[in-house]
Amino acid sequence: MADIRTYVYGATYDSWNRVQTMTYPDGEVVTYHYNAAGQVESMTSNKQGRQSVIVDRIGYDKEGHTVYTKLGNGTETTYTYDKQHERLQVMNLTADGQTVMENSYRYDAVDNILGITNAANPTSLMKLNKAKLGGRSSHTYEYDELNRLIHASGKAKHASYDMVMSFGRIIAPLIS
């Protein structure tokens, strides 16, 4: 016989129909805090009477893009955007003052991602990462004339991948 369980969660909303709280099946209540512009500014948790900070602060630029986040564990991320196209160009993640991720992004004329490069050096993370996980990596993507992903490849440390996709041509329309 199958082990069937029901999980119930709840949510409350403010007068602007924004989530105020989410209650999870284990009793944890996550509260969302908003700035004057109505953007999420921070998130806190209360589980069995223990308060904790999930997201300490989120900063936005005048266009509404997220430019800074600080999590409850102190991890900080900064985001830099291309002013002309408003696309994410660089994302830097730091923890304990050390760079964990340093991603840069490349796009084509229709905003397909062509490449992602992480320039972070895992050997500089000895305090955080004794196993030397992560670090430098690069990924490239190609699209067909309909902007469908047809090729992806990448390399990280001693591993690499290469994926090729193809799409069939529809000869006759589907009839229902």
List each language-model region with its residue ranges.
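Beta-strand elements of repeat-based all-beta scaffolds
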Residues: 1-176
